UniProtKB/Swiss-Prot annotation:
This is Phosphoglucosamine mutase. It comes from Lactobacillus delbrueckii subsp. bulgaricus (strain ATCC BAA-365 / Lb-18). GO terms for cellular component: cytosol. Keywords: Isomerase, Magnesium, Metal-binding, Phosphoprotein. Its cofactor is Mg(2+). GO terms for molecular function: magnesium ion binding; phosphoglucosamine mutase activity; phosphomannomutase activity. It catalyses: alpha-D-glucosamine 1-phosphate = D-glucosamine 6-phosphate. The active site is at residue 103. Activated by phosphorylation.
Length: 450
């Protein structure tokens, strides 16, 4: 179990948990680990960017100081989306990238996430190596001086390359679709107008004026209420919401209904399959994807491979087996023909492309997708990882699954961050599904409760 790194880098309340001192150490130790084996022996180059949080510049300066102290050349991108940084690391042939962002988390939090030269998140082994250096009592890393120190180069115009990359994935303009776009007052805010105007989109924006404090504040992919209202009010055909670092996209249909990552993947995947472009006729998702998603895919002859929770695991499965589409219910969608990580703006563009190519509304494109009612209860327990050792809990799950008779599913898993056991079920009706969950929760509470 890693001490500092979670499922998406190092995160915590800025200046309290994630301090400038920690950012310096992460820059110094992380930079060393990622560039120590540079084959040509030249100076290593690392791209650094951030989202729009007020704490971003504080952490950025500390992080960059750490990188410079081990002789790394830093290309400073300023405000950039996480997928944008991932793309630029590869496009520039850099040795690594570091994004300062806490994604969809509130403004109090921030995070530091490393990418390798391939634009992908680090392996657990690399993160463990960085942690070991951070916790070493005496810092024995190199301390170059004079010409051996790193330098900083302004690379804010890298955003132009990223916007051009996104535009090049779309073969035609996207005129004829009216869309409302929510930038979450985050990293995408500065790029939305330029990108969508270049593609002749009829669009309006909300939450695209970051002030350092309003990122994800009742806006963006995790708070779509205002976007839903605006889509209906403006008579738009579509709404798109990104999160703070724009690695996820949630949509809204013409009636104001939220459309999550499962539904977005169904629309894009169905279109790709119809045109022979969905590799191995398979979509990769996590275990959290709705059973209705799998059933809808089956009716179209598309397979669904599932991984544990986390877009990293979806990405690994896709690369290992050559799949072209995958993602999470939360809106992380990976279209690997274009990018190897979840990209909210890329996803939104390709959802619009399907709507234009088919001439259908989002409601029409989703007509065959019938979502199963889902109930999720978080149960406080003494030891979240021991549930399989409690026979009464296992028996309760088996009993519910037997009663479901294939028309539903149960998923029990420990929380990744808290001492909770998550009990989730999907079934034919909300009432029946609630009853299934209640039966399991009762036994879990009795056997494992605090």
């Amino acid at each position: 179990m890693l001490k500092y790194f979670g499922t998406d880098g190092v995160r915590g309340e800025a200046n309290k948990v994630l301090t400038p001192e920690m950012a310096f150490k992460l820059g110094r130790m992380g930079g060393y680990v990622l560039t120590k084996e540079k084959e040509d022996g030249g100076q290593a180059r690392v791209l650094v960017s951030r989202d729009t949080r007020i704490s971003g510049e504080m952490l950025e300066h500390a992080l960059i100081s750490g990188l410079l102290s081990v002789g790394i050349e830093v290309l400073e991108c300023g405000v950039m989306t996480t997928p944008g940084l991932s793309y630029l690391v590869q496009a520039q042939g850099a040795d690594a990238g570091v994004q300062i962002s806490a994604s969809h988390n509130p403004v109090e939090d921030n995070g530091i996430k490393f990418f390798g030269s391939n634009g992908l998140k680090l392996s657990d082994a690399k993160e463990e190596e960085i942690e070991e250096l951070i916790d070493t009592k005496q810092d024995m890393l190199p301390r170059p001086s004079a010409e051996g120190l790193g330098t900083v180069t302004d690379f804010r115009d890298g955003s132009n390359k990223y916007i051009q990359f996104l535009e090049n994935t779309i073969p035609e303009d996207l005129s004829g679709i009216k869309v409302v776009i929510d930038g979450a007052n985050g990293a995408a805010s500065a790029f939305i107008s330029r990108l969508f105007a270049d593609l002749d989109v009829d669009f309006t924006t909300i939450s695209t004026h970051p002030n350092g404090l309003n990122i994800n504040d009742h806006c963006g992919a995790t708070h779509t209420a205002r976007l839903q209202e605006e889509v209906v009010k403006q008579g738009a055909q579509l709404g798109l919401a990104f999160d703070g670092d724009a690695d996820r996209c949630i949509a809204v249909d013409e009636n104001g209904n939220e459309v999550d990552g499962d539904h977005i993947m169904y629309v894009i995947g169905s279109y790709l399959a119809d045109h022979g472009r969905l590799k191995k006729d398979t979509i990769v998702t996590t275990v959290m994807s709705n059973l209705g998603f799998t059933k809808a895919l089956e009716r179209r002859g598309i397979k669904n491979v599932r991984t544990q929770v986390g877009d990293r695991y979806v990405s690994e499965e896709m690369r290992a087996n050559g799949y072209s589409l995958g993602g999470e219910q939360s809106g992380h969608v990976i279209i690997s023909d274009y990018h190897n990580t979840g990209d909210g703006m890329l996803t939104g563009l390709h959802l619009m492309l399907v709507m234009k190519k088919t001439g259908k509304s989002l409601t029409e494109l989703l007509a065959d997708f019938k979502e199963y009612p889902q109930v999720l209860v978080n149960v406080p327990v003494k030891d979240k990882n021991s549930w399989k050792n409690h026979q009464a809990v296992v028996d309760a799950i088996d009993s519910v699954e037997k009663d479901m008779a294939g028309n539903g599913r149960v998923l029990v898993r420990p929380s990744g961050t808290q001492e909770l056991l998550r009990v989730m079920a999907e079934g034919p009706t909300q009432e029946i599904t609630q009853e299934y969950v209640d039966r399991i929760v009762k036994v879990v509470t009795t056997e494992m409760g605090e």
